[in-house]
Swiss-Prot record:
This is T cell receptor beta variable 5-4. It holds the Pfam family V-set. One of its GO terms (biological process) is cell surface receptor signaling pathway. It comes from Homo sapiens. Alpha-beta TR is a heterodimer composed of an alpha and beta chain; disulfide-linked. The alpha-beta TR is associated with the transmembrane signaling CD3 coreceptor proteins to form the TR-CD3 (TcR or TCR). The assembly of alpha-beta TR heterodimers with CD3 occurs in the endoplasmic reticulum where a single alpha-beta TR heterodimer associates with one CD3D-CD3E heterodimer, one CD3G-CD3E heterodimer and one CD247 homodimer forming a stable octameric structure. CD3D-CD3E and CD3G-CD3E heterodimers preferentially associate with TR alpha and TR beta chains, respectively. Glycans are attached at residue 90. The lineage of its organism: Eukaryota, Metazoa, Chordata, Craniata, Vertebrata. The gene is TRBV5-4.
């Protein structure tokens, strides 16, 4: 992979057993170049009104980006303003990253809860 390419991957967190839990993320993976913008989407289970986003760089643990509760930002990690988000009335969510940098190459995770 060339130095100007960013490899983005997403992980869908699914529950086990007969209880429907989890989220659906899209797209499942992306390849972008430095300076571009990306939007990642997360749809949570019906009734889950809290959505959290995390970034996990290779060889590291997940880092908290931000959390939304009922369409309002409810907490934010140590990420620059070019990382922004939204939560919609149906409690689905978006993570937007502007002016991509090489260090943004990571696994992006979303989680939902009541």
């Amino acid at each position: 992979m060339g130095p100007g390419l960013l490899c983005w991957a997403l992980l869908c967190l699914l529950g086990a057993g007969s209880v429907e839990t989890g989220v659906t993320q899209s797209p499942t993976h992306l390849i972008k170049t430095r300076g571009q913008q990306v939007t990642l989407r997360c749809s949570s289970q019906s009734g889950h009104n809290t959505v959290s986003w995390y970034q996990q760089a290779l060889g590291q643990g997940p880092q908290f980006i931000f959390q939304y509760y009922r369409e309002e930002e409810n907490g934010r990690g140590n990420f620059p303003p070019r990382f922004s988000g939204l939560q919609f009335p149906n409690y689905s969510s978006e993570l937007n990253v502007n002016a991509l940098e090489l260090d943004d190459s990571a696994l992006y995770l979303c989680a939902s809860s009541l």
